[in-house]
A protein has these predicted regions:
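Extended ligand-binding regions for polar small-molecule ligands
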Residues: 1-19, 41, 196-199, 203-210
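Export/targeting segments at the very N-terminus of extracytoplasmic proteins
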Residues: 22-71, 106-109, 123-127, 215, ...
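Secretory-pathway/luminal and periplasmic proteins that interact with or process carbohydrate-rich
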Residues: 23-29, 69-78, 94, 119-122, ...
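Second-shell loop/turn segments in exported
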Residues: 30-37, 47-50, 72-75, 94-105, ...
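Alpha-helical scaffolds flanking conserved acidic
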Residues: 57-63, 82, 130-138
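Substrate-binding/active-site groove segments that recognize
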Residues: 74-100, 107-118, 176-177, 202
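Catalytic and substrate-binding regions of cell-wall glycan-acting enzymes that process beta-1,4-linked
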Residues: 131-208
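Low-complexity, Gly/Ser/Thr/Pro-rich intrinsically disordered linker/tail segments
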Residues: 194-247
């Protein structure tokens, strides 16, 4: 099992670092709107509506949304990502999401669900659907081709390229010349720590959302700060779909 308890501690530390005056630039919202009622956000009805398109549990979609925007529909990054699910302009164009609609919560979530579905299709060689989720999340953040590079490195080094616990190791190593210059790597450098932490944070929060639904046993402040602003994206072309090297 890739997820281990110590990951939650790492996520907690990362989020505390992010919860600083420098990282706040828009509205901030709690990661759990009403614990007793099992209400995660004001957009739960949209997550439930479009999660089947993504083929995901709606709470996983919610966890990803919080990581992307802290449920701020007007969130934007210096790189141009916009809205609840931080859709990049190039991705919006690919999904036929008009610039005028990118901040509209329903259309933004719908576009993200369609993109997740597309990534799911592109990772069908990962036969375990639960394992596949890790790769989809990583690709959403770091780029599909970078994750394929990490899989190629895992295979070359005798690891299982279809297990995230093995591939994550090489996602992290793709920030070092020894690995991003390897002949099997086609798309070069990536900031692997951001992507690995992104996957860990979403998975951890998803587990919390699943545990807090319709119960009062876990409060929003258990392990996760009540509010914090998502950090800025570091990659300009996180969602690039063309078969060219990412920047």
């Amino acid at each position: 099992n890739w997820y281990k308890p110590e990951i939650a501690a790492n996520v907690k530390r990362e989020e505390r670092e992010l919860f600083s005056i420098q990282s706040i630039h828009r509205h901030v919202y709690a990661p759990m709107l009403n614990t007793q009622a099992g209400i995660i956000s004001n957009y739960d009805h949209l997550f439930k509506r479009y999660a089947p398109i993504a083929r995901w549990d709606w709470r996983l979609l919610a966890a990803q949304c919080y990581q992307e925007s802290c449920f701020d529909p007007k969130a934007y990054s210096w790189a141009g990502a916009k809205g609840l699910m931080q859709i990049m302009p190039e991705t919006a164009k690919h999904l036929r999401l008009a610039e005028s609609d990118v901040y509209e919560p329903e259309l933004n979530i719908y576009a993200a669900a369609r993109y997740i579905n597309e990534l799911n299709t592109r990772f069908m060689d990962i036969r375990n659907p639960e394992e596949r989720k890790f790769f989809i999340l990583a690709s959403y953040n770091g780029g599909f081709f970078h994750i394929r590079d990490a899989m190629a490195l895992a295979k070359k080094n005798g690891k299982n390229p279809y297990k995230w616990i093995h591939v994550a190791e090489y996602v992290l190593k793709l920030s070092t010349p020894e690995y991003y210059n390897d002949p099997v790597v086609k798309y070069g450098y990536m900031r692997g720590s951001e992507t690995a932490n992104y996957v860990s944070a979403i998975y951890s929060r998803w587990q919390k959302y699943r545990g807090t639904r319709n119960t009062a046993t876990i409060t929003p402040t258990d392990d996760i700060p009540t509010i914090y602003e998502p950090h800025k994206a570091s990659k300009k072309h996180r969602f690039k779909l063309k078969n060219v090297k990412d920047n």
